[in-house]
Amino acid sequence: EKEELIKQGKIKRDKKESVIFRGEDNSYYLRTGELVESLEDWDFEELPDSWRVCCLGEFCDYGNCTNIDTADIADSAWILDLEDIEKDSGVVLQKVRQGERNAGSTKHRFHKGQVLYSKLRPYLNKVVLADEDGYCTSEILPLEFERNILPQYARYFLMSPAFLRYANKCSYGVKMPRLGTADGKKAIISVPPVKEQKRIIMAIELAFAQLASIAENLA
């Protein structure tokens, strides 16, 4: 959608925005302003022609958050903190309301259907698909994806080994490493047609269900 509007001249491209393109040698490159970088470290050779290779920032509002003062949050509102999310699985361990938590810092507002990504200590792999509206710590980024990317597919991508390697490599800070906004927007995402996204989601969820069943039988 955004690329089409740029082509039509209805909006202008951000000069600092990162864009992936294919060079005359048929290889992929990343352009950020006047800087052009090779993406030879990423393996795109086996991708079907119907898939697109893009930057995460081209498909979602990465880093654009709405800050809300806790004084303006209702007691019944869901307040999501990092401790509420299980690492690697993204399972919400508990839902705590504002009246119970009495959180005192500014929060990010999120909506049902958004992908909630923890930029703090990305190696913990905490990514949630919101099933209701709420508010979260500022260490969590609510992401709104364009309609040609299913939220659940985006969530699994953000939890994938490829994205984890990238996030850990780009994180800054020793004790409290974080993935910066600029690097988050530059992350490479491969986008299949929606029908294929649905097939991938079903396959992943089936695998998770089988693993859960095995773990239950071994307990």
Where is each model-derived feature located?
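Feature representing long, continuous alpha-helical segments
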Residues: 152, 156, 165, 174, ...
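Short helix-capping and inter-helix turn/linker motifs at the boundaries of alpha-helical repeat units
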Residues: 33, 130, 175-179
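A structural connector/turn signal
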Residues: 98, 104-105, 130, 174
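Low-complexity, Lys/Gly-biased intrinsically disordered segments
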Residues: 2-16, 22, 26, 52-91, ...
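A short beta-sheet element
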Residues: 105-163, 168, 180-184
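Non-catalytic DNA-recognition/assembly elements of restriction-modification systems
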Residues: 35-67, 190, 194-202, 208-219
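Flexible, glycine/threonine-enriched loop-and-boundary segments that flank and lead into catalytic domains
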Residues: 5, 27-46, 91-97, 103, ...
